[in-house]
């Protein structure tokens, strides 16, 4: 599967861009800064919208859970870093983000969202809700792109990262709905019977 220049099993498109950091400062960050860690990189259409703050706040609130497993979360939209800062300075009860624990990238030139296949131009002036899981070697492992009215599930994203990390470490594969501690499958015709023999 591919989205723009982003292709499963290949290095994720690199970038350097201005971001609002958790301390409220502006900083240029690059995807290469995160090599050695897993990354959840998600796009949302615009600041000061409706579903977006619920997603971003949920990712921010879960940032420590991701960090515990060696994963960083980065959000991005086509708004400026000044707009991002204004949104983080707006109270949540007024539709703002409040204090953030994750960086928000300003893709004002739309080059990053184009490379990741979530910005197509035309009538839609903002990116779709794309989410990308990138492993510690910088390789793209998962792509999800959805329309805007429905928010994403942070718990499911955390589960997917844990599953990819498990397969990387142990060489076994994870069945549907796998969670840490549950059974996995040895990718071998004979050895896989250990798993399937337990099924009802």
From Swiss-Prot:
According to its UniProt record, this protein's enzyme class is oxidoreductase
Instruction: Write the Enzyme Commission number(s) for this entry.
Output: 1.11.1.24
Q: Which reaction does it catalyse?
A: a hydroperoxide + [thioredoxin]-dithiol = an alcohol + [thioredoxin]-disulfide + H2O
**GO molecular function terms here?**
thioredoxin peroxidase activity
Q: Which key words are in the record?
A: Antioxidant, Disulfide bond, Oxidoreductase, Peroxidase, Redox-active center
Cellular component terms (Gene Ontology): cytosol
Q: GO:BP terms for this protein?
A: cell redox homeostasis; hydrogen peroxide catabolic process; leukocyte activation; removal of superoxide radicals
Pfam families assigned to the protein according to its UniProt record, in alphabetical order: 1-cysPrx_C, AhpC-TSA
Q: Which residues form the Thioredoxin domain?
A: 6-166
In this protein, the active site sits at 52
Key word Glycoprotein present:
no
Please give the subunit comment from the record: Homodimer; disulfide-linked, upon oxidation.
Sequence similarity = Belongs to the peroxiredoxin family. AhpC/Prx1 subfamily.
Q: What else is known?
A: The active site is a conserved redox-active cysteine residue, the peroxidatic cysteine (C(P)), which makes the nucleophilic attack on the peroxide substrate. The peroxide oxidizes the C(P)-SH to cysteine sulfenic acid (C(P)-SOH), which then reacts with another cysteine residue, the resolving cysteine (C(R)), to form a disulfide bridge. The disulfide is subsequently reduced by an appropriate electron donor to complete the catalytic cycle. In this typical 2-Cys peroxiredoxin, C(R) is provided by the other dimeric subunit to form an intersubunit disulfide.
What's this protein's function? Answer: Thiol-specific peroxidase that catalyzes the reduction of hydrogen peroxide and organic hydroperoxides to water and alcohols, respectively. Plays a role in cell protection against oxidative stress by detoxifying peroxides and as sensor of hydrogen peroxide-mediated signaling events.
Q: What is the recorded name of this protein?
A: Peroxiredoxin
